[in-house]
C-alpha cells in the first residue's frame, strides 16, 4: 500500500515531464493558432502616414494579408523583397503592423511622450520602406505591442490571411517565402474569393454565433508591415 501511494505520484510526474519535453521541442511555427477561423481582433491604430486611425473593419469585403514587421527585425529584411514582389504581381492588399518600433534603449536618456514616439517611429519606418520598398497599402503603428498580443504574435515577422468577413484563415510565423506564397497563400486566397461569392461562413460553432444576419461591407477609410 505504501509503495502504491508513492508510485502513483511518481508516474504522474514522469508523464508530465514527457509532455513538457515534447512541447518544448516543438517548433512554434508548427503549432496551429487558436485564432484560425475566428474573427480577427478589432483595433484602431494610427497609420504610418498620419491619415488617422485604421480598423480592420475598413477591409470587410476584401481578402487581405496582415503582416507584422519592424525596422529592427533582421528576418523582416529577408522577407521584405518577397512581399514587395508579391504585392506588385498578385494585387492582394497587404496591411503592415509596425510592431514595437520604439525599443527600451530609445528611452535611455529619459521617457518619451507619445507624440515623440510616434514621430520617431514614423521617421524610422518611412526611411526603411524608402530604402527597401513598400509593399503595404498602409501600415499602422503598434507602439506598445498590445494589438500584436491580441493576435498571438510569437515573433516578428508574422503574416495573417483575413477573409472578406474579417476572419483569420491562415497564419505564418517567420519570413514568408515565394514557395509559401505560391503553394499556401494564393491557393487559399482563390478559395476564399470563391467562398465569398457563395456567401458562406467558416463552419465553426463560434463563427455561427458571430455571423451577422446580412453581409456587411465597409469602404476603406483611406486612399490606399
Where are the language model's segments positioned?
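N-terminal targeting signals for export/organelle localization
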Residues: 1-44, 199-225
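A short beta-strand-turn-helix
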Residues: 43-65
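Loop/turn elements at helix/coil->beta-strand transitions in domains of secreted/extracellular proteins
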Residues: 61-63, 90-93, 135-137
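Short pre-active-site segment immediately N-terminal to redox-active cysteine/selenocysteine motifs
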Residues: 62-64, 68-72, 101, 155
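Hydrophobic beta-strand anchors of alpha/beta hydrolase catalytic cores
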Residues: 65-66, 94, 159
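Conserved redox-active cysteine motifs that mediate thiol-disulfide chemistry
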Residues: 68-85, 99
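Short, internal strand/loop/helix patches
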Residues: 112-165
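Thiol-/selenol-based redox modules, centered on thioredoxin-like
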Residues: 161-225
